[in-house]
């Protein structure tokens, strides 16, 4: 169980980043609903900022783990970023599954699933603009895709950091290297 006790802080930070970005995305999309061009800008900004925050945080965790591994104090665990993303995104996947249930007609869970789908739309506010523009709000597979997207970014960021690959080289330089 050291897998879950070691990265507790980082997993909580992933969840907090999602909540903050959801509020940001929801507020910006609701403020720009009347204007499609502004909604597009806000959707791109919300998704881009979310991807940057998650990728950068996981890159730093991967880089720190690499330093510890080089010093012999850490053994590489390929499942670590995946499990962190699943724990932080448990609400996302649960909500996505409930959205799927909401689409099955005449089920006992229909009302509960619709309530859960609306809660998910609040949790995924940073994707709301893009999904709204694509007119796919009622397609439950879109919400599962959104939940899977966060897992993909988390795994890519961690592995890039662990291998020392940087998409923005100046962002991950030390002070000595910048001068």
Model-derived segments and their meaning:
Residues 1-62:
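Transmembrane alpha-helical insertion/packing segments
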Residues 24-37, 98-108, 134:
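Juxtamembrane "helix-exit" motif on the non-cytosolic side of transmembrane helices
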Residues 54-88:
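Membrane-helix interface/capping segments
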Residues 83-116:
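Hydrophobic alpha-helical membrane-insertion segments
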